[in-house]
Swiss-Prot record:
Binding site for Zn(2+): C928, C931, C948, C951
Highest classification ranks of the organism: Bacteria, Bacillati, Cyanobacteriota, Cyanophyceae, Oscillatoriophycideae
Cofactor binding mode and count: Binds 1 zinc ion per subunit.
Cofactors required: Zn(2+)
Function: Catalyzes the attachment of isoleucine to tRNA(Ile). As IleRS can inadvertently accommodate and process structurally similar amino acids such as valine, to avoid such errors it has two additional distinct tRNA(Ile)-dependent editing activities. One activity is designated as 'pretransfer' editing and involves the hydrolysis of activated Val-AMP. The other activity is designated 'posttransfer' editing and involves deacylation of mischarged Val-tRNA(Ile).
Entry binding sites for ATP: K613
Keyword NADP: no
EC number: 6.1.1.5
Cellular compartments annotated: Cytoplasm
Catalytic reactions of this protein: tRNA(Ile) + L-isoleucine + ATP = L-isoleucyl-tRNA(Ile) + AMP + diphosphate
Gene Ontology MF terms: aminoacyl-tRNA deacylase activity; ATP binding; isoleucine-tRNA ligase activity; tRNA binding; zinc ion binding
InterPro entries: aa-tRNA-synth_I_CS (IPR001412), aa-tRNA-synth_Ia (IPR002300), Anticodon_Ile_BEm (IPR033708), Ile-tRNA-ligase (IPR002301), Ile-tRNA-ligase_type1 (IPR023585), Ile-tRNA_ligase (IPR050081), M/V/L/I-tRNA-synth_anticd-bd (IPR013155), Rossmann-like_a/b/a_fold (IPR014729)
Short motif 'HIGH' region, span: 60-70
Protein name in UniProt: Isoleucine--tRNA ligase
Amino acid sequence: MTEAKSYKDTVNLPQTKFDMRANAVKREPELQKFWAENQIYETLSENNPGDIFILHDGPPYANGSLHMGHALNKTLKDIINKYKLQRGYKARYVPGWDCHGLPIELKVLQSMKQKEREDLTPLKLRHKARDFALSTQKEQSESFQRFGVWGDWEHPYLTLTPDYEAAQIGVFGQMALKGYIYRGLKPVHWSPSSQTALAEAELEYPEGHTSRSVYAVFPITKASDTAKKVLTPYLKDLGVAIWTTTPWTLPGNLAVALNPDLTYAVVESGKPVCKHQYFIVAADLVDKLSATFETPLTVKATLKGEDLEHTTYRHPLFDRESEILIGGDYVTTESGTGLVHTAPGHGQEDYIVGQRYGLPVLSPVDEKGNFTSEAGQFAGLNVLKDANEAIIKELEEKGALLKEEPYQHKYPYDWRTKKPTIFRATEQWFASVEGFRDTALEAIKNVTWIPPQGENRITPMVADRSDWCISRQRSWGVPIPVFYDEETNEPLLNEETINHVQAIFAEKGSDAWWELSVEELLPQPYRNNGRKYRKGMDTMDVWFDSGSSWAAVAKQRPELSYPVDIYLEGSDQHRGWFQSSLLTSVATNGIAPYKMVLTHGFVLDEQGRKMSKSIGNIVDPNMIINGGKDQKKEPAYGADVLRLWVSSVDYSSDVPIGQNILKQLVDVRNKIRNTARFLLGNLHDFDPEKDTVAYEDLPELDRYMLHRITEVFTEVTEAFETFQFFRFFQVVQNFCVVDLSNFYLDIAKDRLYISDPNNLRRRSCQTVLKVALENLAKSIAPVLCHLAEDIWQFLPYKTPYKSVFEAGWVELESEWKRPELTPKWSKFRQIRDEVNKVMELARKDKMIGSSLDAKVLLYVSDKELREHLDSFNPSDSLSNNRVDELRYLFLASQVDLVDSPKTIGKANYKSESETLGVAIVKADGEKCDRCWNYSTHVGEFVDDPTLCERCNAALKGEF
């Protein structure tokens, strides 16, 4: 008996050194090194043929490790930049850092011993703060680069460099010369814990703040002429009732504001609730207040709000009289009494009313939040600690307290110290938004906002905002370049002085303000003009720092342009950087600094909760990349998985992340990787120059596949063009699994492995594989940049491009688009799904092992479909084009089209409906040793008795 021949070496199995595993911790840094050594980003951003494209970086704060918000933000930016580079744009990205401000100052102070703090001069503090900011910036920069983010990392912008600070002084100077900068005593958000003014963007409003609210009565002393008639009968024992959630502001009370259009009532209380028998409240609130005070209030008289104007009352705690005045539309009947206690030194609306009536700005509180001597008996008490208690007690003793109750509401806290803030009037520098508000609102309309509701967020913020307080009482920042006349305290701020300081900062940096004398900082004409000056010690709000970046970076660097194409940050920046940049740019140039603004949400855990140390649900981006201490619990996934997560979520709202989500993403990455590996392995002997099959010679299956490739990558392109990266994620994942792995590649194995290497049947398939592989690599490159490059480096044939990024974007030929093929092939694929289901039943019962053990019986009622199927079912496996056949489509050895559904009914394994019947029976003939198909021709060939007719022909180079 002769030994059976082995045909193992005659089969064309895949060959590639492309690793099945990503091994990201080792491989990603190698690929990043390859990009750096070959200067891929630099070359493309410099030499691409298209327009310059600028996504301007909103600077992260240089004061700690990166969190998931940073990862989301920087990766989104990088996806856009890489896509634009692939599309031929000169995408130039300069990463930036916000380096000044209180948070860094606090970090430095916290790291020092008490003794060190006592010896601290502003200059020493600034040097320590600079060192801290620079070391943090370096760490963050390395992390961002490990994410795979491209940019000009050698020349980032830092808000602490001399060129930046000088440009910022330039913006300030232009605004000052246009009359938009002024000094005023105004109430501002003041943080006693930081001892400085704060901007709106530096506040947060935590849940669950409870204030001690009080209803109090101020005795009326004189009725206005228009109210005399109504009030006179009650004047002897009449008060005006107010409500406040900040009793500590009562020493600053200089008026009571009302709404002129409301009706007010003089009420009498059923039982005594204060020393007055009668008091005035809004008529609409009588019933509500009766319940609050737990006594019936009887209406004795009513009058219009406007008639009460100029009625006077006495302050219950101080020896002074004030008037009832007309307030704004903030005086409502939603809460309180319909009459608002007004302290112009402690509130924005109060201040505006006070200005209208010429009231002084009284703010008897110092920078630590303690009452000054102006608060009389309350001097020395802290307004956030013991002042409320003392004031409420005093109101009670004077018979002026109606009721005290806890009130839960949103209250502003210092975003860094996490402690409550107050409104306090101080001498500050302001940017007058009023001067250019309309231009700013017009500019907003000319910007594209993605998502569109961004416009609806920023518009009311700009429309309703007060003037911008830009001064801070801290050392670590850019100084406001103002001098004061020692004698008159008049500020000196003009073109000459500003330009002189700007030139000094450009050369020496803003430390010069502390290092140089007043004489050196002043231009020549002011040095000996008979006046003595001192320099101001306020620094600028850090939002003015970052808000000047368009001027310091985009406008100043020759390789960039202004206005820039895109700003992209979190949705909280409508009140922050988007707005400060808009205001400075509009004030100086009349235009927005950006053409488009994209916003993303916040990162939450898998349960949709905010990340916090106390819950212990913080996900660290570096941990995702490099893994944790326990690699079983926290494996190292690499940067691509992090980037894939960014593309998988709808970033326009808040987005979740956690271990379960990451595991799913690893699966998706691996599926894409394995698909690419199969494609690479089966192209090992393909030379595109000589082996490519012309389109007109391709089997219909291949032409259908090229049509699907066109559909898929057109949709991917549209996803990137519209910044809907989650669509890219869904489409590519679906393409790899449904179109390639489960369909085309499944069918292709027979052609690729069994046919003669040079046969058209095989080369036509490889022609499609090459198109699929290259377009897959290019399309994932903006997101899975490391995987895409890894694939490209293992291409088995010559390519003129050393990097996938040099190869540009996906390439699709117009002739590949054949929508007319879709209906027929969709039907074929549906039938295939049905066949697979029945195969599975037969396999489960062990009637068949592989699908090649089966013959498929098929009944269709539709005449046209029957004809299509007939044309795909030749009687002879060596005729036709040997590709467009049902047996290959179904991965079966034979297919019979039957004329009657009864034939299907007789089989054990079947699926029947009115229009389609599928049955699985044993295949005819013997199993071929080489291709494992069953054939009635096995045994016919003397030299190869165990082979079928296809393999016999293949070995002769004919199949």
